Amino acid sequence: MSARIGAHVDQADPLAEAASRDADLVQFFLGDPQSWKKPSVAYAGGAAALRADAEAAGVDLYVHAPYVINVASTNNRIRIPSRKLLQQTLSLAAEIGAQGVIVHGGHVTADDDPSAGLDNWRKCVEGLDLAVPMLIENTAGGTNAMARRLSTLEQLWDAISAASGFEEVGFCLDTCHAHAAGEELAGLVERVSAITGRIDLVHANDSRDGFGSGADRHTTLGQGQVDLDGLAEVVRSAGAPIVVETPGEGHLDDLAWLRRVLAD
């Protein structure tokens, strides 16, 4: 088994959370994911201590950006604070030595031209100081989402590939979101890689809802409606670190399943 695996955990002591799961990596928020407040480090001793202790423990850190961020938006009151909060998150993630910051692709409204959202993403990448990689994540629903369907993801990648700093932009593939968006997991890694050229992180999640539902409701691996054979194919073929974002009480079972699949 070569892939490093872990889970999304509480931010207060992510290293203790990693140890309790025998995890190689952890993902967490830097503050309230539903707030516009400036991100902060909850770990005792702050950013420097977390970085040093993570390095000593051999645990990789990933930061999930707040859900409120939507840099694709044509609404100035959403887009401008989104860019500011994203930059603050990236900068603090660099201080703790994070491997990357995961951010959702965002959306425009039904009245907007989708190309405006794509161009807003390009401008965002141009304006960011990417001290750590930014990993754009596919999303589950939304007719006007930038990263739900592969056809739109291809347009997004075409738009941002022209931006300076693009080399620090990667992709996070979420299996629950792909399932909810109506994307078959079989062959998905190849289809995504043909667009992005890279997969930097996998969110290995099951779904409480049916294929193409558009619903973003994760559940424990094997207890939902995601095809487990397809999920196994994704984690084996992506060649990327893996995070489970499933209910915490099932993390040990989920990580054990991943270890078995990756060992086969």
Task: Enumerate the language-model features and the residues they cover.
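Hydrophobic faces of well-ordered beta-strands that scaffold small-molecule active sites
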Residues: 3-9, 26-28, 61-65, 101-103, ...
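Active-site acidic/histidine proton-transfer and metal-coordination neighborhood
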Residues: 55, 71-170, 180
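Aromatic/hydrophobic pocket-lining residues that form the small-molecule binding cavity
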Residues: 11, 47, 82, 86, ...
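Active-site beta-loop-alpha junctions enriched in small/polar residues
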Residues: 8-12, 31-33, 66-68, 106-108, ...
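C-terminal helical cap(s) of enzyme catalytic domains, especially alpha/beta-barrels
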Residues: 251-264
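Gly/Pro-rich active-site loop or hairpin
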Residues: 112, 146-150, 154, 177-241
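Acidic (Asp/Glu)-rich catalytic clusters
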Residues: 16-23, 42-62, 88-97, 126-131, ...
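N-terminal pre-domain/capping segments
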Residues: 1-65, 69, 73-88
